[in-house]
Amino acid sequence: DAFNALFEATWLINETHGGENHARLLNYIEYAQSNDLSIGVAMTDGKGDRSKRPSQQVQPDSYVHVTERRADGIVISGVKAIITGGPYMHEFLVMPCRRMQPEDKDFAVACAVPIDAPGITIVSRPAGRPGNPAAMFSAKFAQSVAVAYFDNVFVPMERVFIDGETDEAHIMTTNYATHHRHSCIGARAGFGDLLIGAGAMIAEANGLDYEKTPHMREKMVDLIKITEGFYACGIAASTMGVHDAAGNFRPDRVYSNIGKLLLANQIYDMHRLAHDLSGGLVVALPSPDEDHNPSTAAMLSDVLRGHPDVPYQHRANVARFIEDLTASETGG
């Protein structure tokens, strides 16, 4: 998403102002691909006082900005507040998160920085819930989100893609939103598929048959409708995409944004429907420690069984899986 956004922006900079910005980006993309690097997108700034522009902030480090320009590069300072996978990336792509006016020129900066560059401090929470037996998903699959503070970090010129070009920086931000919302549709559709499958399993474990339980069937239909609805927007955005000015493919903006609006608003309905399909055990089930407690294991296995042909342990595992996805510190 970030590379796609920068592709057109740097091309436009060269077309309008001249320079080597686009060539630098292409060289960096080749470098990242050749070395199989994981690149974290450092885009969302701390933002400070939301009523003020970046250049009006009492604390200028609320936004990443250029503090010094040298012949061989730039120096940047400021905070990026939400970096997915931050601690386990090789490098950060630093990019502006909003439209910059001419007075915000120093804040219109995009560049590539190794995460161990001098002056970077990364603060993060652990990814998921490793080692937690109740975390049926996030014990193995999760993501960490980082805050990164750049304290006068030097960036060589060959890694600088945007520096003060506010109009092109705005185009980059808009393009990134389109690409990222498009890819987010696929991610959330996959999440919806997990809930649909888990909902089918928990109903069976609870002893219910969708063919004979109309109100449950309606909830499952709603869950499928929501998931496939925004996924269809993703398909439409893909098939109706166009080539941008630089010749790069861009998904359709309208369907990318409609899909993102649908999933962002209806993710809460997806959680609610998963809970309706599951029942109270999702949040009330005893700890997995009790599954092996000789004083309670046999009793729980007997009285908390649902369908007689479905073992209690399977019912418990599915319930904990849904809890992990929808009602835990990771997915709630």
Kindly give the residue locations of the regions a language model identified.
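Internal helix-loop-helix
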Residues: 1-39, 85, 91
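Beta-sandwich/jelly-roll carbohydrate-recognition scaffolds of carbohydrate-active enzymes
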Residues: 26-29, 51-56, 60-65
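A short, Trp-centered hydrophobic/proline-enriched beta-strand micro-motif
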Residues: 36-49
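Structural beta-strand/beta-sheet cores of well-ordered domains, especially the beta-sheet scaffolds
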Residues: 37-39, 72, 90-92, 107-111, ...
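A short core secondary-structure module
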Residues: 79, 83-131
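Glycine-rich beta->alpha junctions and the first turn(s) of the following alpha-helix
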Residues: 132-226
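Long, well-ordered mid-to-C-terminal structural blocks that present hydrophobic/aromatic surfaces
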Residues: 191-269
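Alpha-helix capping/hinge segments and adjacent helical runs
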Residues: 254-332
